[in-house]
């Protein structure tokens, strides 16, 4: 099948989670015999035409010039290019800046949308932006032929709010068979006797709620490791609040 992946800055991954997924999933699809195209920003560090068999389609991305607004133009450029290519499937990763162009999506391909998280609830966004993101979510939920939820909570939300079925597909991870257990000594924990939270240090990820629960459970003394980029305002807040 001829498959397109939209909604990321491109592959290989230099940016974040959706790019990481696009990199590995696109190559996997090629290995399964599909013809795969991934849209990249024109200024992506990788400027080759193919990546491990994946066709790379560079499109103009003025984010460097206009900030977030440039993402809407980039997504528009990707969609307009996709209209010319007779794809069988279009996989959109996220909906923030592409759902407003739903009426331009080519009609023939099956349109699959990974709905990401509840972006409109993120506290870092102003009220007008949150309202826009809520509308963007509604447009994506209504226009997608198939929806993908990366958590059971999102799947339940989509059904309750939009009466739309979705397929739950959790994020994957690399498995390794020979971990270096000596690393645990650096953190003063033992194999099989610790809990771990790995997340972005942002308020909406509720790390403080997790740690408050741990602090209140006086009977369970299992150590907990919190992993993430903690050199942030929220990270400083957590370290001060739970320093004991």
Place the predicted regions along the sequence by residue.
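Helix-loop-beta element that forms the nucleotide-linked donor phosphate-binding surface
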Residues: 154-174, 187-190
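Conserved donor-binding/catalytic core segment of Leloir-type glycosyltransferases
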Residues: 4, 185-217, 225
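N-terminal strand-loop element at the rim of the active site
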Residues: 8-14, 27-66, 153-155, 159-161, ...
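An aromatic- and histidine-rich active-site surface loop
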Residues: 70-83, 87-116
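Acidic anion/phosphate-binding donor-loop and adjacent secondary structure
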Residues: 124, 172-191, 236
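Nucleotide-activated donor-binding/catalytic signature segment of Leloir-type glycosyltransferases, i.e.
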Residues: 236-244
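Membrane-proximal helix-turn-helix segments that form the acceptor-binding/catalytic region
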Residues: 80-83, 129-147, 156
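Glycosyltransferase donor-sugar binding loop
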Residues: 44, 173, 198, 221-237
């Amino acid at each position: 099948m001829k498959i397109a992946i939209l909604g990321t800055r491109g592959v290989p991954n230099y940016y974040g989670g959706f790019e990481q997924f696009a990199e590995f999933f696109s190559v996997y699809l090629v290995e399964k015999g599909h013809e795969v195209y991934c849209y990249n920003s024109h200024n992506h560090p990788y400027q080759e035409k193919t990546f491990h068999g994946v066709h790379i389609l560079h499109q103009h991305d003025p984010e460097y010039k206009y900030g977030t607004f440039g993402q809407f133009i980039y997504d528009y450029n990707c969609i307009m290019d996709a209209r010319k290519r007779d794809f069988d499937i279009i996989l959109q990763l996220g909906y923030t800046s592409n759902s407003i162009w739903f009426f331009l999506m080519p009609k023939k391909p099956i349109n699959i949308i990974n709905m990401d998280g509840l972006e409109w609830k993120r506290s870092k966004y102003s009220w007008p932006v949150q309202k826009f993101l809520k509308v963007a979510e509604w447009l994506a939920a209504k226009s997608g032929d198939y929806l993908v939820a990366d958590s059971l909570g999102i799947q339940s939300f989509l059904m309750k709010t939009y009466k739309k079925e979705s397929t739950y597909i959790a994020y994957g991870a690399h498995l390794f068979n020979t971990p270096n257990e000596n690393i645990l000594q650096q953190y003063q924990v033992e194999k099989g006797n610790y809990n771990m939270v790995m997340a972005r240090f942002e308020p909406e990820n509720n790390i403080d709620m997790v740690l408050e629960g741990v602090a209140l459970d006086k009977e369970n003394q299992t150590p907990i490791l919190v992993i993430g980029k903690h050199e942030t305002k929220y990270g400083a807040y957590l370290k001060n609040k739970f320093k004991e």
